[in-house]
Swiss-Prot record:
Full protein name: Thiamine-phosphate synthase
Requisite cofactors: Mg(2+)
Catalysis: reaction(s): 2-[(2R,5Z)-2-carboxy-4-methylthiazol-5(2H)-ylidene]ethyl phosphate + 4-amino-2-methyl-5-(diphosphooxymethyl)pyrimidine + 2 H(+) = thiamine phosphate + CO2 + diphosphate; 2-(2-carboxy-4-methylthiazol-5-yl)ethyl phosphate + 4-amino-2-methyl-5-(diphosphooxymethyl)pyrimidine + 2 H(+) = thiamine phosphate + CO2 + diphosphate; 4-methyl-5-(2-phosphooxyethyl)-thiazole + 4-amino-2-methyl-5-(diphosphooxymethyl)pyrimidine + H(+) = thiamine phosphate + diphosphate
Recorded name of the encoding gene: thiE
Annotated Mg(2+) binding sites: 84, 103
InterPro entries on file: Aldolase_TIM, ThiamineP_synth_sf, ThiamineP_synth_TenI, TMP_synthase
Binding site for 2-[(2R,5Z)-2-carboxy-4-methylthiazol-5(2H)-ylidene]ethyl phosphate: 148-150, 179
Molecular function as annotated in GO: magnesium ion binding; thiamine-phosphate diphosphorylase activity
Role, per record: Condenses 4-methyl-5-(beta-hydroxyethyl)thiazole monophosphate (THZ-P) and 2-methyl-4-amino-5-hydroxymethyl pyrimidine pyrophosphate (HMP-PP) to form thiamine monophosphate (TMP).
Amino acid sequence: MHQRLATLAAARLYLCTDARRERGDLAEFADAALAGGVDVIQLRDKGSPGEQRFGPLEARDELAACEILADAARRHGALFAVNDRADIARAAGADVLHLGQGDLPLDVARAFVGPDVLLGLSSHDRDQMTAAAAGPADYFCVGPCWPTPTKPGRAAPGLALVRAAAELRTGKPWFAIGGIDAQRLPEVLDAGARRVVVVRAITAADDPAAAARRLSSALAAAR
């Protein structure tokens, strides 16, 4: 747990990726992204091109994809995260379980995954953010900063919520999330964030390692 917390504290770039079933290159992609500077890598297949083409990811296939990402994360000294599924997180030996507001309560998730798995929580307004900062989650995310196809129909609180998070001056790690890419990153940094979650900025890149490196370098320069 202590090593995971230390790795989390130093983390700046958090990537959510789908299982890339339509491409069949998950292992190669993960290695490239992690080599480029991704600190945390999470599997999130909801709404992905693979889901649209092949249907929802079955639990057995999700576990197999998790094992690929977990192995890559270990080799690169990064953290591997599972989205929503406490059972998959436990089975895959995940470092992190990330939960949304409508997922398992944190105390229930903690009882299921044990004391060594880090817990993260999404927040989408000031009340949720303040509660997340004060609560038992090991880190929290704030956003979306911009509307994103990853969360269709969800209103984006925008950079105002990022500014509010920065004003909390909490010692707990937090990440800005939602529609962030290399072009928008300066705005996010100006709002006070020093950690970000990205999706398409790396998953849609022709060169994932280069895309990750560009983001990681900008985050490092802003410390």
